[in-house]
Amino acid sequence: MAKEKFERNKPHVNIGTVGHVDHGKTTLTAAITKYFGDFKAYDQIDGAPEEKARGITISTAHVEYETEGRHYAHVDCPGHADYVKNMITGAAQMDGAILVVNAADGPMPQTREHILLARQVGVPALVVFMNKVDQVDDEELLELVEMEIRELLSSYDFPGDDIPIIAGSALAAMEGRDPEIGENKIKELMAAVDEYIPTPERAVDQPFLMPIEDVFSISGRGTVVTGRVERGVINVGDNIEIVGIKDTTTTTCTGVEMFRKLLDRGEAGDNIGALLRGIDREAVERGQVLCKPGSVTPHTKFEAEAYILTKEEGGRHTPFFANYRPQFYFRTTDVTGTVTLPEGTEMVMPGDNLKFEVELIAPIAMEDGLRFAIREGGRTVGAGVVSKILA
């Protein structure tokens, strides 16, 4: 059969496998590619190359496959630490995830941690694959494990009663045996993923936002700010807000240019210059954002989920304590902030991941799910994500 050319007429969804070590995430990933993509052997996936995201090295394997209705990009990580880093940095954006649980063991510590991380970093939906069912003889035991998984999901505010749980064997599917627990279950799983994990809103359909990277004044024309449009569309004549650092101001975009050509609009992914009406060059600075009025608000206090780099990763060599004051790098700029550790936590070691509160000295345009780097004098010592805005 001739290879079909890749067509972008299907909606694209980013997905990943999560769950406890050795519960079968990579085997399941390989099995899905066997039926829905170009087959990748287990060791091709497991020997994932290292990548850098926000100065942090992460091993991740990427595969792609498609169902009748969708195209998927799927990420699988070899080690637990890679998952933590991946989810916190957002290196591989996940629109949904497949939680793999070994039916013989039930939920284990990393099962819990990955569900918590998915909740904290805003993975919208999970589907469960209960793996290795051929190792469980007792039908009642499977039902108990399923109940336990549902209760666990509910305890982390996922809709435990509604989440699809498919029980099968990824290995049987890989080896092409016992289709009733193998191939058929992989197909059932992907049908559930197709139906249950929502199609993400495309970046251009979201409200306009552009982090400001640079500010120029052009004599006779006014002030131009440059940056890459993160999401949405900006048209000449649109009213926009400038948010963060200083008080929010409203202006009108009187021109959009790209590669020195004038355009009537800029959209997600474009590097543009936007001409702002009646705005003084001194009134805008790097680190602010241009956005659709009312879509994003400035904040100084938030709760974050963070990963602190190890010494080997170029991070700190020593722990930090209460009232630690590093810089938090949001989008295009550093803002100093003070860390409040959770009750009972005295210190944080390099290599830890934890939840803490931050209070910044200046407000930043912020929403849940915003990623940041933690820096000391320009050196990255950690990465985090805003899990909850406090003030």
Swiss-Prot record:
Keywords: Cytoplasm, Elongation factor, GTP-binding, Hydrolase, Magnesium, Metal-binding, Nucleotide-binding, Protein biosynthesis. This is Elongation factor Tu. It catalyses: GTP + H2O = GDP + phosphate + H(+). Coiled coil: none annotated. PROSITE patterns: G_TR_1, G_TR_2. Residues 131-134 are annotated as: G4. Belongs to the TRAFAC class translation factor GTPase superfamily. Classic translation factor GTPase family. EF-Tu/EF-1A subfamily. It comes from Ruegeria sp. (strain TM1040) (Silicibacter sp.). GO terms for molecular function: GTP binding; GTPase activity; guanosine tetraphosphate binding; translation elongation factor activity. InterPro entries: EF-Tu_GTP-bd, EF-Tu_GTPase, EFTu-like_2, EFTU_2, G_TR_CS, P-loop_NTPase, Small_GTP-bd, T_Tr_GTP-bd_dom. GTP hydrolase that promotes the GTP-dependent binding of aminoacyl-tRNA to the A-site of ribosomes during protein biosynthesis. Residues 76-79 are annotated as: G3. It is found in: Cytoplasm. Residues 55-59 are annotated as: G2. Its EC number is 3.6.5.3. One of its GO terms (cellular component) is cytoplasm. Pfam families: GTP_EFTU, GTP_EFTU_D2, GTP_EFTU_D3. Monomer. PANTHER family: ELONGATION FACTOR TU, MITOCHONDRIAL, ELONGATION FACTOR TU-RELATED. Mg(2+) binds at T26. It comes from the Bacteria. Residues 169-171 are annotated as: G5.
